[in-house]
Amino acid sequence: MNRKIILAVASIIVSLSAASAQTSEGTFQRYNRWMVGGEFVRNIFHANGFGVTGIYGRQFSEIVFLGAGFGVDTFIYNGGKSTTTITDADGNQTVIIRPPYRYSFLVPVYADLQVNFSRSRSPFFGELKVGGAVQVDLERIRGTHNTNELELLGGGVLMGAAAGKRFALNNGDELSIFLDIDCILGPWYANVPVSLGIRYGF
């Protein structure tokens, strides 16, 4: 099922790229570009986090961009706190409460298709993503003996969609604000991160 969906999305990407190249031939100078930015993320485990993302690809026309994306989303995965009790020579005890100690890193890699809904300098756009992602947890316990444990929690196939608005800058670059919903499914893993972010394209 996943294979059929991926093949269907890939065929749509190829068709749009070809059509865009034909309509822009002789009027648009294609170029490679970067898009980098950050985003606020919330997942189905009710964990909030912040992510950074980068996308590199080719602008085929005023309408179609096709590239490869990657990034890291970081969550405070467990809201608990670690405590340390210190007893001095007189028997007095001091309790130290430390910040949340478990962190989660979601690492996606994906093919990225962005389509502008108009040829204006500041258009609305839609985005499709197909790829994969893994989640790694880091547990830090700080007490009498400090320990750090890294664990591969899981991962799977990533499929996502986004919509947003571009804002053209005077130097020819742009800022994009977007809302993104991803679905990551694996044999023993499921996650649906939702993010609100901003990207700088150049």
Question: Which residue stretches match the model-derived regions?
Answer:
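Gram-negative (and chloroplast) outer-membrane scaffold detector with strong preference
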Residues: 32, 37-42, 50-145, 156-159, ...
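Short, exposed beta-strand-loop hairpins at the edges of beta-sheets
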Residues: 183-188
